[in-house]
């Protein structure tokens, strides 16, 4: 297996992988499914094994949804801060899964949590990535009103990643929700402006504009498809690629 992996040369040297918090739920209705964590750790480990540097951002929707409580009257800033804490919890769980698979990992938080995580520091993050560690960026940007998608794009730009890989439940971007519309058609490739003009809802406006302004390629793919992540990194055409026209 190791020989097979080493024979496949990576197309990307450094990636930023964005996972939704919901992805960690698996078949559960809430929280974290350990089986999903272990499978994701294994797939990330395959990338590390062929020399790819992996930055990781995980959402917090499996543990906390601020939007619902905001609609019920909770202060938006308070809700966003609670959501940031949920991403830290997911980051700690993922670090544990990676380390149990003998993959070195570091959790960095945009909010200072002495004794729990390292505080986010770009130069330190890049040193650890260069040393073969998976770096998990948690607590979003550290500011309310910014999504974890925006945080993922921001961190990717800061650490000079080659691509943002957004893991979803479907194998790319479609003209409509393929779960609701059987006639929905998949896009193989899009430009940032097409995503914005068609209002495709791939990521929020801030995230897409960040990628467009800094020319950061973005690929949307299905993390539930075994081997999809590795296939992308060695040059396969999984999902939908979003880049400059």
From Swiss-Prot:
Q: Which residues form a coiled coil?
A: none
Activity regulation annotation text = Inhibited by UTP.
Question: A Pfam family matched by this chain, by name?
Answer: AA_kinase
Q: In which pathway does it act?
A: Pyrimidine metabolism; CTP biosynthesis via de novo pathway; UDP from UMP (UMPK route): step 1/1
Q: Which domain of life is it from?
A: Bacteria
Binding positions (UMP): 60, 80, 141-148
UniProt GO cellular component terms: cytosol
State where ATP binds: 18-21, 61, 65, 168, 174, 177
Q: Chief location of this protein?
A: cytoplasm
Q: Does the keyword Cytoplasm apply?
A: yes
What is the documented function of this protein? Catalyzes the reversible phosphorylation of UMP to UDP.
> What family does the Swiss-Prot or TrEMBL record give for this protein?
Belongs to the UMP kinase family.
Query: What does the annotation say about its assembly with partners?
Result: Homohexamer.
Q: Which PANTHER family match?
A: URIDYLATE KINASE (PTHR42833), URIDYLATE KINASE PUMPKIN, CHLOROPLASTIC (PTHR42833:SF4)
Q: What is this protein called?
A: Uridylate kinase
Species = Pseudomonas aeruginosa (strain ATCC 15692 / DSM 22644 / CIP 104116 / JCM 14847 / LMG 12228 / 1C / PRS 101 / PAO1)
Write the lineage as a comma-separated list. Answer: Bacteria, Pseudomonadati, Pseudomonadota, Gammaproteobacteria, Pseudomonadales
